């Protein structure tokens, strides 16, 4: 009887702990949802009340005009940053995944990318100003701002792409090597197509973070209230976060309205990007269809073409270059 009573008390204690943990989980979830809904409601309410077609389709600054230069400039800067970070990020992840014999180099790269992830954006902005704007004489420009954003986007793309590669079943990769496939074939036929959804998630995360940055752009892109940049260098660029940062500090109601509208556009854009990344299986299937033919092209360029030249060379008796 005494033993049954002890078992009953233990079961009751475990049940009480489970209930308490569940309640705490629900409270945490409710708290986060309350904060998220409050932010969305406050921003969208303020932006929707002030938005108009004229504001969305005209250039301006925080005291006059609209936010079209900010909308276009934001995505120009993000696109430029993606241009500078996508290829190094993906190929860096390929190296981290395939570099079995150079583990110390791969570990050093992971350390550097982790450190780069934690660098404050204002430090990247200061570096961009001193090195890109002044030292390399790019001026306040699309290239300088895009490079600053690319530095920030690079570690996110690299590490998430690496994790996507490592989630692929190792047996598939080893079987491909056992059948005689080289690194190019494994990368283009297995890694890239199967990890395409994860790569997309990393890209969208980097884009979402870059679209909301302000500090490094103040140092590298300045602001253009006259319209779009006239060139890649020595021409400032407008962006939405400037409207938010500068407009909310102005005394006029018009500047506050532009700040709310810009914040609303940003939060809606980021939400759409996140939703796309959540439905990565659908987008991933589309990317696999695109990357499949790309793998065939790369295979023909890097693998089949050299082998054909080798066959032709050996048929003529030109074998000395092999030695």
Language-model segments: which ranges?
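Transmembrane alpha-helices
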Residues: 183-221
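C-terminal transmembrane helix and the adjacent membrane-cytosol boundary/short C-terminal tail
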Residues: 100, 163-166, 204, 245-321
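Interhelical loop and adjacent transmembrane-helix boundary motif
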Residues: 63, 217-268
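Transmembrane-helix boundary motif in ABC transporter permease subunits
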Residues: 81-113, 126, 274-282, 286
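Generic hydrophobic transmembrane alpha-helix motif, especially the helices
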Residues: 114-151
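Membrane-embedded alpha-helices of multi-pass transport/permease systems
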Residues: 37, 41, 87-94, 126, ...
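Glycine/proline-centered hinge or cleavage motifs at structural transition points of membrane proteins
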Residues: 120, 179-180, 193
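Periplasmic/extracellular loop-to-transmembrane helix junction in inner-membrane transport proteins
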Residues: 4-23, 43-83, 244-256
